[in-house]
C-alpha cells in the first residue's frame, strides 16, 4: 500500500474495475428481495452542477447501502432530452438540438461515471430516441381510442418569448416557469389528456403515501382542489334566461351582491342579440389581452351588461358584469356569484364600480368579520342573512344548503381545481404527436405498425421553432389520400411521466412494457428529486401509473413508495443588463467583488468590466448561469471528497449553500482514514502487535463505541435519512480509533482490524473508491462491492452498569446500581420500591423527585 493517498489513481482504477465487471448490472431475481432506487433524470443541459451532484450522490448512497443489505438493487439513469432547454442551447450554439443533446449527454455521462455512481448503464434511457418515444406514441393512441385524449379549442397559457403553450402547472405567479415572461391567454386548438377522470383517486391515494413529504401531499391536495357545494340557478330579471353558478361557501350566500360572467359565457350571445349598445362594448373589450393580467391587476376591468339576476332567497337584484378578474376553462361554469365582503378581488371590483358590499358575519363580540379574517375563521354568527340570522357558520351552511335544495333552486355538486392536462406544444424539439388530419378535419391516429413517427432532421442546423415549416414531412399519403401530420409536439412531461416504468424493461420490444418486469420492480422503493416537481412531474407520474395499471401493465396503485425531496444547492448569483436592455446572468467565477462590513458583496464586476448586480444566494441553474462545474473539484480533490462533502454539509431536505471550504475538511478526513489503514498494515507487517484473549477496558470501550455507531448509522441512513449525522458518527469513531492506536503502547491488532473494517464498510456508500482500495488492502482479493453491511455483535462486552446516588432531602442515603439501558421512569420506580428507601420514607408524603441523568436521584419530602 502506498503511503500517500492519490485520488486520481485510485478512482481511475476502481471505476475501470466496475466497468469491466459490469458490477452494477442487475436482472430480476425472485429469490432476492428487490430494491428500486432512482433519482429524477436530468436534462442534458451541458454540464452537471452541484445540484445534480447532490441528487445523484444521494441516490447512489442509498443504492449502495441497500446492496450491502443483500437486496437486488435496480439503480438506473436516463436523460430527459426533449424540450426548450436543449432547443434554446442549440440555437445559441448554432447546431441542431439533436447534436447538442447527444454531445451534452456524453459529457454529463462521463461526469456521472467520474462521480462513481453505481448505475446499471445497460438500462440507460434517452427520451429523444425514437426507440423510447415510439412506445409513448403508442400509449397516446391507446388513450385516444379509449376516449382519454382529445383535441379542442381552448384558452391556454401562452409564453410570448418561447412561443408555446404552458400547462397550468408551468405558470408560476402568472410568469413562465422557464423564462419568467408575462403569460398571455390565447384560444387555440390543443391536445388534452383526461387527468380529471382520476381526480378522486389521485386525491384519496395520497393517504397511502406514508413515506412522502407532507408538504408534497399538501401541494397536490391543493392543486387537485376538491370542494363540495351547490349548483345554484339564478333567474335573470325580465327574461327567460338563467345562469348556473357553483357556490361552495354557502354560509355567506346571503352576501352575494353582483354576478360576473366571462366573455365566453353563453349569455353573451343573448346580450349581443338583445342589447346592441352593450354588444359594441363587448366587441371592443379585448378579453384575450386583459386576461393575461388576471389576478395580478390591482384594479379589475369590467362591462355592465344592463342585466340583473335575482337572488334566489332574498330576491334582491344583482347586477351582471363581464370582467377579467376571474378565468375558467370550464365550458359549463363561466360565471361567479360575487361576495365582495369576503374576497379581495371581488372587493376591489366592487369599490371600483361602486357596487354594494354586504357583510354577513359577526364574531361573538358583535364585531363584523371582513375578508382578512374570514379565511381563518372558525367561529362566527350570521347577520344580514334574513331567516338565517343568528346561526353559527356550520348551521348556516347546512340550513342554506337545505333551503336551496328543498326549494329546487340548487343541487349538490363536487368541483375540482384540477383541469385536464394540456399536452401539446408548438415547438420543434419534442416527440411528434402520432395523429393525421384529413381535409375534412377528421382525426386519424397513426397505426401501431407505422410507429414511431420520427421527428424530421433540422436542415443545415437551421432551427425552426415549429414543425409547420417542414412541408415535406407534414404532408403524407394515407389510403391514397393526402393528409396532414399534427404539427404540435408532446409536452416533455409526457416522456418523464413513465420513464420509471420503462427502466424495468428497456430492451423489451413486444409492447409498451413487460408486465413481468414492472410487477417485479414496482413500486419504486426510493425516488429522489426536487419539491418543485410536486404539482407537475410527481402528479403526472402518479396519473400515468394509474393509466398503465388500468391497461394491465402494472398491478400496484401507486408508483413510488418513498420520496425524498432534496434541498437546493445555492450559489452566489449575478446579472447585468446588456445594451439592448436584456438581463444577462453571469457565472460567479468570472467576477471580482468586495465585501462590506456586513459581509455583503458590493462593487461586483465581470471580466469584461460589466457592473454586476448580486441578488444573493439562489438555486444553481443553467438559466441563471450560476452553476458550479464539479469537474474542477474532482480534478483537484477526487470525487470521494466531493461526495463526502455534499452528504455531510447539510441534511438532505435542506438547502445547501455552496462553498469550497468544506471540501478541504472532507479531503483531510479521507487522508486520515488512509493513514490509519497504512499504519495498521505496518503494525501487522512489523509484528508490532499482540493478540489478547482477554479484552482490556480500552478495547471494550472502542468495540462498544463501534457497535453503537453501527446501530446509529444504520438508523440514520435507513429510517431517518439524516446522512450528515451518520457521517458525523463515523468520523467520531475514526478519531476514537486513531486515539486508541496513538495512545496505547501495545495495541490489540485484532481490535484495530475489526473496528477499521467496520469504519470502511460504513463509509463505503459515501466514498466507495477509497473504501474499495482500503478494503482490498486489508482483505486481499476480497471485493467490498459484494460485502455485507456490518452487524452488531456484543456477546463479549460486559453489561455496563451505572451507579445512581440516592438522596432524601439532599442527604445521601444509598447508592443503587442500574443497567445502563434503564431509563428515568424505571430508575425512579426502582428507587421508590427499594426496601431501604421504603423504610427511610416511612410512608411520608413525597413532594418531588429530582433526577440528574445517570448521577443522582433526590427525593424531596413534603414538610406538612
UniProtKB/Swiss-Prot annotation:
Recorded superkingdom: Bacteria
Sites where the protein binds ATP: 622
GO cellular component: cytosol
EC number(s) from the headed UniProt entry: 6.1.1.4
PROSITE patterns found in the cross-reference section: AA_TRNA_LIGASE_I
Motif ('HIGH' region): 42-52
GO molecular function: aminoacyl-tRNA deacylase activity; ATP binding; leucine-tRNA ligase activity
UniProt motif ('KMSKS' region) ranges: 619-623
InterPro entries attached to this UniProt entry: aa-tRNA-synth_I_CS, aa-tRNA-synth_Ia, Leu-tRNA-ligase, Leu_tRNA-synth_edit, M/V/L/I-tRNA-synth_anticd-bd, Methionyl/Leucyl_tRNA_Synth, Rossmann-like_a/b/a_fold, tRNAsynth_Ia_anticodon-bd
BP-aspect Gene Ontology terms: leucyl-tRNA aminoacylation
Top-level EC class as recorded in UniProt: ligase
Main location per the UniProt record: cytoplasm
Keyword Disulfide bond (UniProt): no
Gene3D superfamilies: 2.20.28.290, 3.10.20.590, HUPs, Isoleucyl-tRNA Synthetase, Domain 1
Keywords in alphabetical order: Aminoacyl-tRNA synthetase, ATP-binding, Cytoplasm, Ligase, Nucleotide-binding, Protein biosynthesis
Signal peptide coordinates: none
Catalytic activity: tRNA(Leu) + L-leucine + ATP = L-leucyl-tRNA(Leu) + AMP + diphosphate
Places the protein is found: Cytoplasm
Protein family membership: Belongs to the class-I aminoacyl-tRNA synthetase family.
Protein name stated in the entry: Leucine--tRNA ligase
The organism of origin for this protein: Wigglesworthia glossinidia brevipalpis
Origin organism lineage: Bacteria, Pseudomonadati, Pseudomonadota, Gammaproteobacteria, Enterobacterales
Amino acid at each position: 500500500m502506498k503511503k500517500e493517498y492519490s485520488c486520481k489513481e485510485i478512482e481511475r482504477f476502481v471505476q475501470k474495475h466496475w466497468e469491466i465487471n459490469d458490477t452494477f448490472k442487475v436482472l430480476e431475481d425472485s429469490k432476492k428481495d428487490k430494491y428500486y432506487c432512482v433519482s429524477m433524470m436530468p436534462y442534458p443541459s451541458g454540464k452537471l452542477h452541484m445540484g445534480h451532484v447532490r441528487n445523484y450522490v444521494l441516490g447512489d448512497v442509498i443504492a449502495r447501502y441497500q446492496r450491502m443489505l443483500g437486496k437486488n438493487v435496480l439503480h438506473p439513469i436516463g436523460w430527459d432530452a426533449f424540450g426548450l432547454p436543449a432547443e434554446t442551447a442549440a440555437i445559441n450554439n448554432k447546431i441542431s438540438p439533436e447534436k447538442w443533446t447527444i454531445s451534452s449527454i456524453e459529457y454529463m455521462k462521463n461526469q456521472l461515471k467520474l462521480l462513481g455512481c453505481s448505475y446499471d448503464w445497460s438500462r440507460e434511457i434517452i427520451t429523444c430516441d425514437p426507440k423510447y418515444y415510439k412506445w409513448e406514441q403508442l400509449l397516446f393512441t391507446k388513450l385516444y381510442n379509449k376516449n382519454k385524449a382529445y383535441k379542442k379549442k381552448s384558452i391556454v397559457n401562452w409564453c410570448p418569448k418561447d412561443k408555446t403553450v404552458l400547462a397550468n402547472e408551468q405558470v408560476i405567479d402568472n410568469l413562465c416557469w422557464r423564462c419568467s415572461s408575462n403569460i398571455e391567454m390565447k384560444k387555440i386548438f390543443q391536445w388534452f389528456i383526461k387527468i380529471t377522470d382520476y381526480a378522486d383517486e389521485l386525491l384519496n391515494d395520497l393517504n397511502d403515501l406514508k413515506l412522502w413529504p407532507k408538504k408534497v401531499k399538501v401541494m397536490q391536495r391543493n392543486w387537485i382542489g376538491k370542494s363540495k357545494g351547490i349548483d345554484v340557478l339564478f333567474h335573470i330579471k325580465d327574461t327567460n334566461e338563467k345562469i348556473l353558478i357553483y357556490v361552495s361557501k354557502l354560509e355567506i350566500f346571503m352576501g352575494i351582491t353582483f354576478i360576473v360572467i366571462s366573455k365566453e359565457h353563453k349569455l353573451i350571445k343573448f346580450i349581443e342579440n338583445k342589447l346592441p349598445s352593450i354588444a359594441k362594448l363587448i366587441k371592443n373589450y379585448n378579453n384575450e389581452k386583459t386576461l393575461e393580467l388576471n389576478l395580478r391587476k390591482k384594479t379589475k376591468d369590467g362591462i355592465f351588461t344592463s342585466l340583473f339576476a335575482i337572488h334566489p332567497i332574498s330576491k334582491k337584484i344583482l347586477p351582471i358584469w363581464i370582467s377579467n378578474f376571474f378565468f375558467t376553462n370550464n365550458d359549463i361554469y363561466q360565471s361567479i356569484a360575487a361576495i365582495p365582503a369576503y374576497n379581495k378581488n371581488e372587493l376591489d371590483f366592487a369599490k371600483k364600480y361602486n357596487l354594494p358590499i354586504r357583510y354577513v358575519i359577526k364574531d361573538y363580540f358583535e364585531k363584523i368579520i371582513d375578508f382578512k379574517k374570514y379565511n381563518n375563521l372558525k367561529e362566527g354568527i350570521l347577520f344580514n342573512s334574513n331567516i338565517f340570522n343568528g346561526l353559527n357558520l356550520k348551521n348556516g351552511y347546512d340550513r342554506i344548503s337545505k333551503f336551496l335544495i328543498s326549494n329546487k333552486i340548487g343541487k349538490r355538486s363536487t368541483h375540482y381545481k384540477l383541469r385536464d392536462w394540456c399536452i401539446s406544444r408548438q415547438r420543434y424539439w419534442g416527440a411528434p404527436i402520432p395523429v393525421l388530419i384529413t381535409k375534412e378535419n377528421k382525426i386519424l391516429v397513426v397505426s401501431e405498425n407505422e410507429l414511431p413517427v420520427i421527428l424530421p432532421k433540422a436542415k443545415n442546423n437551421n432551427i425552426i421553432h415549429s414543425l409547420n415549416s417542414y412541408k415535406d414531412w407534414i404532408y403524407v399519403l394515407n389510403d391514397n389520400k393526402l393528409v396532414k401530420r399534427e404539427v404540435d409536439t408532446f409536452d416533455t412531461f409526457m416522456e418523464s411521466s413513465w420513464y420509471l416504468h420503462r427502466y424495468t424493461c428497456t430492451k423489451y420490444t413486444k409492447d409498451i412494457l413487460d408486465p413481468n418486469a414492472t410487477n417485479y420492480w414496482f413500486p419504486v422503493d426510493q425516488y429522489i428529486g426536487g419539491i418543485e416537481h410536486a404539482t407537475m412531474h410527481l402528479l403526472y407520474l402518479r396519473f400515468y401509473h394509474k393509466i398503465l395499471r388500468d391497461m394491465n401493465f402494472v398491478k400496484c396503485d401507486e408508483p413510488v413508495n418513498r420520496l425524498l425531496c432534496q434541498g437546493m444547492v445555492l450559489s452566489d448569483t449575478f446579472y447585468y443588463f446588456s445594451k439592448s436592455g436584456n438581463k444577462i446572468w453571469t457565472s460567479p467565477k468570472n467576477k471580482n467583488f468586495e465585501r462590506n462590513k456586513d459581509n455583503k458583496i458590493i462593487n461586483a464586476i465581470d471580466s469584461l468590466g460589466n457592473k454586476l448586480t448580486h441578488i444573493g444566494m439562489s438555486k444553481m441553474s443553467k438559466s441563471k448561469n450560476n452553476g458550479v462545474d464539479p469537474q474542477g473539484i474532482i480534478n483537484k480533490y477526487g470525487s470521494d471528497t466531493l461526495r463526502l462533502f455534499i452528504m455531510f454539509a447539510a441534511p438532505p431536505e435542506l438547502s445547501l449553500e455552496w462553498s469550497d471550504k468544506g471540501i478541504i475538511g472532507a479531503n483531510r478526513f479521507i487522508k486520515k482514514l488512509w493513514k490509519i489503514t497504512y499504519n495498521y498494515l505496518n503494525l501487522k507487517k512489523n509484528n508490532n502487535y499482540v493478540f489478547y484473549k482477554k479484552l482490556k477496558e480500552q478495547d471494550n470501550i472502542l468495540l462498544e463505541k463501534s457497535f453503537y455507531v453501527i446501530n446509529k448509522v444504520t438508523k440514520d441512513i435507513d429510517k431517518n435519512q439524516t446522512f450528515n449525522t451518520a457521517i458525523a458518527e463515523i468520523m467520531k469513531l475514526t478519531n476514537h480509533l486513531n486515539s486508541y492506536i496513538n495512545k496505547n503502547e501495545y495495541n490489540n491488532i485484532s481490535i484495530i482490524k475489526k473496528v477499521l473494517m467496520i469504519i470502511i464498510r460504513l463509509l463505503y456508500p459515501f466514498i466507495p473508491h477509497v473504501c474499495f482500495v482500503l478494503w482490498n488492502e486489508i482483505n486481499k482479493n476480497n471485493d467490498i462491492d459484494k460485502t455485507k453491511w456490518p452487524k452488531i455483535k456484543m456477546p463479549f462486552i460486559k453489561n455496563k452498569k451505572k451507579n445512581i446516588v440516592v438522596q432524601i432531602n439532599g442527604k445521601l442515603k444509598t447508592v443503587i446500581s442500574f443497567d445502563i439501558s434503564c431509563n428515568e421512569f424505571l430508575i425512579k420506580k426502582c428507587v421508590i420500591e427499594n426496601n431501604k428507601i421504603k423504610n427511610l420514607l416511612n410512608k411520608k408524603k413525597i413532594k418531588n423527585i429530582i433526577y440528574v441523568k445517570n448521577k443522582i436521584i433526590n427525593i424531596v419530602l413534603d414538610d406538612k
